[in-house]
């Protein structure tokens, strides 16, 4: 088989026994010795969409859900024209405040997307180097639609690891165009910047799917296993008598090779391997013997505890002062990716034993090793030799020392002023000076303090407040023993067939996905309580990353974690841990599969029809209660483009932009019924696309509300409104005053609340309206 390429050679004369020709041009391309299966036909109108190809869909979303901007400041300081004040003015380049905010949002989304894309590129290239380009993508007999995002965006199914390189090439090309639009004197419209942010979010979705797909098939991670094992979670599960290797970050390769080295040398029981953040999630997907310390909020506390003999860092969400903190108690640091070199010498080509000796003897502060297999050997050998030397360092300041340190406090109050959650830090320190550690202990046990360390930076007496908080909570650390279900990967096709109709018709009231980071306003318990609320109400609860860990750190009144109480099936009352940050792609993927499997919508190149279906029919809502990073911004924006609303915590307003609907503007909610061709009155469902709630109570009510969809059957709508009203009464004390907007006919009214609701309807002069048969925002 000859694959024609553009390079060519010309022959002036070509003669033979039966051939005589001149000026023949022959193109010779790659010679392929093995026949490849024919590529699937591209079915949809827009495969591999360029920056503007989905702009019309974006504008429909932005017309309904107008951007609400909350800038940190009114200045633009991006070029040497500035700095320019934009409050009621334009900058020297002509940009206004809204457009500048939209550009900032696009930049944040691109940073997040680049982080996931860089991660995916690392994985794909390394795994191809190990296994070859022809390594098959196979998720088992229960998953036929193994890459729903890739199929929809690229227009074809990836069959091998090599095919994923093509996906990465496309995403990286799009990111280059998007970033160029941020240059001074380029895009000048805020909504077009938002359209580009949507495209960046879609590229983020795409590259996350590539990353998780590659590691699932190449490392044999669970392939949609609803019975994925329960693994250990919490400080108290770590055996501090053993050498301890701690992995921090998101790239599974170094951690997997550490586990492999232990296994190959029959040392599994001699060394503890644990992780913080998504590295922990993915290492336990690879080997259930590894342990999860907790979400990224545990990072500084655990490093300060001195438990880790070796700290292996890869990429994303690692404290940039990790080396400085590790050196305080002689923990060895190994950096493993080009994203985070920490100023360390590159030891990739050095003999492993030499690296170990240099680390043990303090000849180097740490090592940069870009070969994951070598990381495995060096990390284990270093931990084995360093642990006996460091045994006396695995402790925090004693109680008397804490009292002495606290007595240095000058009552300046700066620790409280700079605390992101305005915790009573100074009061806790003052009580500690009197020998009362209860307030410090409360901050540790209730996870109110997520150890950002800003209080220490401001303290004029250099009081190590985070270390004091950690020590105060130490006596309870031994009780921090929980169970979390290992990340299972995508929803199986058979599960989608089972739940597709109940979700679209409203019989299952919704799919709620708790994702994101641990920048919580009042601790991780809030996430667990919200998850518990919706599990008890028959929702499907999906989770990933730090959110999955926070849910696991809660025990109910029976002493069980929610993972022990609820199964891992993608079905009503299922608590589904899909995996790490990159596994968030399976949340969007499940919604896409519903459109394909239940509604028979073709995927390939058919983004707009799929997104339109999800927006109007699939009752799903994302919750990023502790979102802090640019990655979280990209994830939320990508999910929004598919038509899935997201609720943020109060810190989410710092992303500078929300997508809020106006329920009072009836024109914005009109729908086209594709079955009849008529434009009909709609309802604010979902009312918002990106919303920041002030507290758990408000968020819980809003989540239930954002699962309402125009296609709910009367029975399904009754169920959804029953939850909405019940939660509103439970947390806010009243029946919602907008309930009339969601009653289409009297059949929608929950029987339990019929009298109260009918009274409201009469007061508001409510009129019944027609139910849409096939609602859409599209013209066709």
Curated annotation (Swiss-Prot):
Binding site for [4Fe-4S] cluster 3: 409, 412, 415, 459
Residues annotated to bind [Ni-4Fe-4S] cluster: 250, 278, 317, 517, 546, 581
SUPFAM superfamilies documented for this protein: alpha-helical ferredoxin, Prismane protein-like
Residues holding [4Fe-4S] cluster 2: 76, 79, 84, 93
Recorded catalytic activity of this chain's protein: CO + 2 oxidized [2Fe-2S]-[ferredoxin] + H2O = 2 reduced [2Fe-2S]-[ferredoxin] + CO2 + 2 H(+)
Residue positions binding [4Fe-4S] cluster 1: 73, 77
Cystine pairs: none
Family: Belongs to the Ni-containing carbon monoxide dehydrogenase family.
Database matches in PANTHER family: ACETYL-COA DECARBONYLASE_SYNTHASE COMPLEX SUBUNIT ALPHA (PTHR30109:SF6), HYDROXYLAMINE REDUCTASE (PTHR30109)
Full protein name: Acetyl-CoA decarbonylase/synthase complex subunit alpha
């Amino acid at each position: 088989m000859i694959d024609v390429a553009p390079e060519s050679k010309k022959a002036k004369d070509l003669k033979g026994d039966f051939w005589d020709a001149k000026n023949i041009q022959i193109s010779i391309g790659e010679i392929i010795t093995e026949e490849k299966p024919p590529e699937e036909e591209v079915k949809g109108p827009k495969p591999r969409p360029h920056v503007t190809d989905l702009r019309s869909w974006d504008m429909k979303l932005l017309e309904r859900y107008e951007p609400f901007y909350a800038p940190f400041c009114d200045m633009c300081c991006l070029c040497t024209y500035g700095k320019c004040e934009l409050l009621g003015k334009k900058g020297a380049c002509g940009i206004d405040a809204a457009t500048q905010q939209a550009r900032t949002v696009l930049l944040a989304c691109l940073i997040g997307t680049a982080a996931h894309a860089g991660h995916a590129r690392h994985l794909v290239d390394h795994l191809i180097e190990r296994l070859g380009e022809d390594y098959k993508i196979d998720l088992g007999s229960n998953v036929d639609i193994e890459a729903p995002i890739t199929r929809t965006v690229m227009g074809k199914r990836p069959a091998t690891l090599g095919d994923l390189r093509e996906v990465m090439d496309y995403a990286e090309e799009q990111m280059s165009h998007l970033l160029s639009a941020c240059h001074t004197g380029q895009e000048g419209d805020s909504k077009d910047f938002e359209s580009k942010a949507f495209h960046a979010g879609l590229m983020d979705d795409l590259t996350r799917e590539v990353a998780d797909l590659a590691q699932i098939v190449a490392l044999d991670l669970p392939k949609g296993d609803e019975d994925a094992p329960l693994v250990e979670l919490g400080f108290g599960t770590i055996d501090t008598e053993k050498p301890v290797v701690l992995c921090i970050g998101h790239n599974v390769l170094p951690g997997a090779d550490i586990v492999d080295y232990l296994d190959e040398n029959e040392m599994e029981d001699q060394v503890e391997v644990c992780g913080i953040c998504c590295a922990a999630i993915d290492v336990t997907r690879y080997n259930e013997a590894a342990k999860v310390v907790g979400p990224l909020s545990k990072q500084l506390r655990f490093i300060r505890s001195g438990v880790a003999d070796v700290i292996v860092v890869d990429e994303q969400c690692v404290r940039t002062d990790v080396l400085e903190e590790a050196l305080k108690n002689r923990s060895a640091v190994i950096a493993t990716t080009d994203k985070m070199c920490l100023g360390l010498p590159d030891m990739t080509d050095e003999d492993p034993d030499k690296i170990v000796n240099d680390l043990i003897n303090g000849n180097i502060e740490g090592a940069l090793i870009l070969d994951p297999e070598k990381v495995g050997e060096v990390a284990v050998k270093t931990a084995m030799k360093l642990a006996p030397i460091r045994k006396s360092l695995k402790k925090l300041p004693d109680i008397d020392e804490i009292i002495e340190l606290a007595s240095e406090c000058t009552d300046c109050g700066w620790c409280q002023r700079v605390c992101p959650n305005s915790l009573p830090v100074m009061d806790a320190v003052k009580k500690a000076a009197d020998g009362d550690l209860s307030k410090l202990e409360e901050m540790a046990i209730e996870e109110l303090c997520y150890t950002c360390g800003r209080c220490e930076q401001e303290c004029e007496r250099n009081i190590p407040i985070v270390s004091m908080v950690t020590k105060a909570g130490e006596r309870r650390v031994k009780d921090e023993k929980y169970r979390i279900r290992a990340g299972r990967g995508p929803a199986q096709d058979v599960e989608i067939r089972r739940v597709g109709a109940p979700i679209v018709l409203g019989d299952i009231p919704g799919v709620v996905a708790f994702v994101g980071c641990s920048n919580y306003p009042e601790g991780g318990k809030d996430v667990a309580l919200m998850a518990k609320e919706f599990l008890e109400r028959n929702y499907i609860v999906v989770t990933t990353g730090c959110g999955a860990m926070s849910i696991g750190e809660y025990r109910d009144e029976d002493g069980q974690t929610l993972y022990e109480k609820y199964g891992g099936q993608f079905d009503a009352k299922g608590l589904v841990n899909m995996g790490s940050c990159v596994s968030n792609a399976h949340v969007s993927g499940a919604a896409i599969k519903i459109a394909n499997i239940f509604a028979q919508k073709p995927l390939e190149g058919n983004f707009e029809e799929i997104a339109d279906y999800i927006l109007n029919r699939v009752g799903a809502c994302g919750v990023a209660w502790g979102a802090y990073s640019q990655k979280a911004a990209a994830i939320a924006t990508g999910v929004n483009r598919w038509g899935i609303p997201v609720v943020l915590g109060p810190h989410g307003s710092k992303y500078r932009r929300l997508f809020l609907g106006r329920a009072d503007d009836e024109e914005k909610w009109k729908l086209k019924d594709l079955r009849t061709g008529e434009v009909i009155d709609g309802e604010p469902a979902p009312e918002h696309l990106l919303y920041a709630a002030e507290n758990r109570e408000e968020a819980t009510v809003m989540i239930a509300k954002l699962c309402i969809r125009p296609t709910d059957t009367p029975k399904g709508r009754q169920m959804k409104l029953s939850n909405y009203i019940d939660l509103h009464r439970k947390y806010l004390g009243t029946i919602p005053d907008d309930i009339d907007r969601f009653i289409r006919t009297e059949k929608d009214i929950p029987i339990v609340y019929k009298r109260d609701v009918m009274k409201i309807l009469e007061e508001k002069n409510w009129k019944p309206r027609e139910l849409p048969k096939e609602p859409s925002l599209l013209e066709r």
